[in-house]
Structure formats: C-alpha cells, structure tokens
Amino acid sequence: MIYRLSDEYYVRPLAPADLDGPYPGWFEDQDVCRYNSHGKLFRTRAYFREYLDSLKLDDRVVWAICHERDGHVGNISLQEISPIDRTAEFAVLIGDKRHWGKSLGLLAGRQLLAHGFRKLNLERVYCGTAATNEGMKKLAAKL
C-alpha cells in the first residue's frame, strides 16, 4: 500500500529496510526530538527491530513519509487505536530536516486521517503536544 501525496512525496508502511537508513539516527537529534520523549534515551538497533515487529501485533498504524529522491524522511502514525471508542492519537515526526517547512505533516496527515476515518471507522482522532510546539498546534488546527 502506497499513497501518493504529491509529485515528490508518498507514504507507505514502515518497513524493516528503514532500519538501515537514517531513521534510527533521528532519535539522537535533539532538534528533531525537541517536542517528544524519543530523544531522551539512547536507542539500540534491537530496540527499533522490536518496535517494528510490534507493529504487526498492536493498535498502531505507522507510515514512512518518503521523498522520491531522498527516501524515508519522516513517520506519521495513528497510535492508541481504540476499536471500542473508535478513537486514535495522531503523531508525526519529520526526521530529515531538509524536509522541514514543506507541509509534509499536513499532506501526510490528511491521507492518514482519511485512512483512519474511512478504513478504520474512527470517529475521533486527537493529538497531544507541548504548549510551545507551535508547528503541531497549527497542524492540528488545519487538520
């Protein structure tokens, strides 16, 4: 499953090959992790492998945001999906700083929310962020 976002960008499920790219290194970048808890602890390759394996078993949808030339540049997800309450939490991380400011959260977010509401039959999607995270607050308002 691949969803085209624009001529340059698309989303697809996170894959084992992503562990060999820049993805694990994003969590060592304090700018990338400024508004989340991912950068607080060192993460081993085994950690990322276990995370990827857990996606097959639990209540998350995690997509890689990809650029035609640069490959995997970020992730977007629905987490804590509750089939009973029909809710989920929205999260996004653009790890490749060359792609910041290109509205990827909005492009990918629209596609992910359409998937959540149409395919997963969700009724409500929420997100939480730091009060100082102006980018996420603006994104949430637009979505």
Task: Please identify what each model-predicted range represents.
Residues 52-53, 137:
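Short amphipathic alpha-helical segments and helix-helix/interface helices
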Residues 1-19, 29, 62, 66-143:
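Acyl-donor (CoA/ACP) binding surface of acyl/acetyltransferases
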Residues 26, 36, 103:
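Short, flexible helix/strand-to-coil boundary loops that buttress conserved ligand/catalytic motifs
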Residues 16-24, 45, 49:
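An amphipathic alpha-helix signature
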